[in-house]
Amino acid sequence: SSIGETQFQKILGHHHIYKEWNNLANNLEKTSYLSAQVKEEIRRMLAQKNHCQYCKAKGKPRGIFGNEKEQICIGLVEVYMKVGDRIPHEIIQLLKQNLTKAEIVELFAFISFTNCQQQFGALMKLNPSD
């Protein structure tokens, strides 16, 4: 499709969901409670797991964290990548002790939607050269 700016958006441009999908993506990417840097690190981590070539093209995770809160967020993603939704109770407690409820919700929503986008890109065999 010619609708959209990126190759990913152009694939979705064939469907009526493009606008809503893109709005959700833009809203979740905006910095609200979590920094843009930690969100980008999470995106890069998930891209390696999801085998989306298009998503992986932006680079590997950097492994650089600004503060303890960001380290906890990244640690959660590492656990999530290994066990999926079976996050141990201790990890959830650590999140609750160090992040606000709003930060936890934003973190989980960002992880979930980013994971979904990248799996879609992998299923569609989207490549950076497309």
Which ranges hold each PLM region?
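Hydrophobic alpha-helical segments
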Residues: 1-130
